[in-house]
């Protein structure tokens, strides 16, 4: 990675505000994606579906992501995400989260890149097999 080419002077308060509603968006309101994600938004799920596919690869932009979230909630209506911790450092951020599927719990981490204005431009997401301890 070329450090100089990838330096962005990001509005950290706006970036943190985007992360503050990230899980609300996953849990209840896909419209939030249109406010906090950039037009060139991408998400990379590093855990594929059971059949080896990765529908997140087709997401490009906030509108596309909002549709993806609606589809996800239709397929997983009992999923509830909760924040463990988050941090923003310039153009980058991270969030540790837990998800509850009925009696099953797991944890994960999302790593974010932000635009200059604090919109989420890109996310790398990894889910684990056990929840984070809180």
PLM feature spans:
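C-terminal and inter-domain tail/linker signature
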Residues: 1-134
């Amino acid at each position: 990675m070329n450090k100089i080419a990838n330096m962005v002077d990001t509005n950290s308060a706006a970036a943190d505000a985007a992360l503050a509603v990230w899980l609300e968006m996953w849990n209840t309101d896909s419209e939030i994606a249109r406010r906090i994600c950039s037009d060139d938004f991408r998400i990379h799920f590093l855990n594929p579906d059971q059949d080896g596919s990765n529908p997140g690869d087709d997401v490009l932009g906030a509108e596309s992501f909002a549709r993806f979230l609606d589809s996800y909630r239709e397929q997983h209506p009992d999923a509830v995400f909760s924040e463990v911790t988050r941090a923003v450092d310039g153009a980058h951020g991270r969030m540790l989260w837990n998800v509850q599927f009925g009696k099953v719990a797991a944890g994960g981490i999302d790593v974010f890149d932000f635009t200059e204005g604090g919109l989420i431009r890109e996310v790398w997401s990894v889910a684990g097999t056990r929840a984070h301890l809180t």
